[in-house]
Amino acid sequence: MSYAGRRIGKAALSLCVTTALTVGVGCGVASATSFDAAAQPIDLGQTQVGMTIEQSQYIARQLKPVPLKVTLKKGPRRPIPEWAKSSIKPNPFFDNDAWRYVRKGYKPGQVMRQRKARWVKGYFPIAARGVQYAYVSYDSRGYPMTATATLVIPHHLKPNASVMEYNQFINSSGPNCSVTTQMNQLFSWGMMTSTIQMVGAALALGYPVLLPDGDGANNIYAINRVASHVILDSMRMVHEQHDFPLAKSHFVSLGASHGGMMTGYTAAEQPYYAPDLTAYVNQFVVNEGAPDLIKLAHSFGLYGELQNAPSVYGSFLMSFVVGAAREYPDLLPHLYQLFTPYGKAVVKGNRSICTPLTFAVGPGV
């Protein structure tokens, strides 16, 4: 298996290990039914709280190698399970209707709609202008999806100036957690602090800044092949948009924590998903990696009763479970049936909120 394949397989394995955190009794996939299941869904085996490495390896052996090049499709993707959907209705700007545009001939990175970034000067006083774009991208299986990004422009913009593409951490599943949403409201729940510092420095030096919403329109946390497509297509979007003279701009991609995961996957995916950008991406910089989710899940399993062994990182794991269920509903069609009442309550509380509120929910996991 390729390096990218191993990494994505590892993420899928982490989901399966994480599933054990909220189950009550053993339950195999074969014991349940679902009309929306894949032909061969993942069998989680006899899941339990103290899941062993051998049990997780049983799951891992079912995972197929990930193809390096995604085959792009035209039809809509599978719907998200009701239990994994956010209780907050997103703004129509984020409607996941890219497949309609693809059928009209739209290409990856092509702009579907745009709007002004309402509070760009509130967050970045040094900025001259900010525009938010919704554009065509593709999910991890090649289905069309809507992606969004904010382009912040400095004063005295030079034609084809190099662009800093910054991947903000999100760590949550709510629809109001994206940078694009945060920059259209006054209060950002602390999401924008590091972004303000990084972006302000780049703008002061005269560089435009690109801020994609790496989790996509469905707020899919930690499924980083999705994020890599969002990011690469945001670069294509910068070349395609007509508001600013950036058709030949080069990029430096930077991210920390969750943003670091997104940046690393983008570096691995770029030669296969967006070879046309090879000459335009100067560097990928992973400032800080995220914790190993598999080791994290196993360490939780050692405690047995997880309600009595709180960890702030439990919020990450719950966001990951929700994100994976949104991206791969057919591969894990019976996941919700394995949750205890406590696990269901944690998911319900986590699926619509942003960092740092997820930390308030997470310690009980």
Give residue spans per PLM region.
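Bacterial N-terminal signal peptides that target proteins for export
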Residues: 3-16
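C-terminal segment of classical bacterial N-terminal signal peptides
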Residues: 13, 21-32
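Catalytic-loop region of hydrolases
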Residues: 33-158
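Accessory cap/linker subdomain of secreted extracellular hydrolases
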Residues: 42-98, 290-365
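Short beta-strand element of the alpha/beta-hydrolase
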Residues: 148-151, 159-172, 176-181
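Short amphipathic alpha-helix adjacent to the substrate-entry channel of hydrolases
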Residues: 180-209
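Alpha/beta-hydrolase active-site loop
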Residues: 194-197, 221-243
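Primarily recognizes the serine-hydrolase "nucleophile elbow" in alpha/beta-hydrolase
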Residues: 236-307
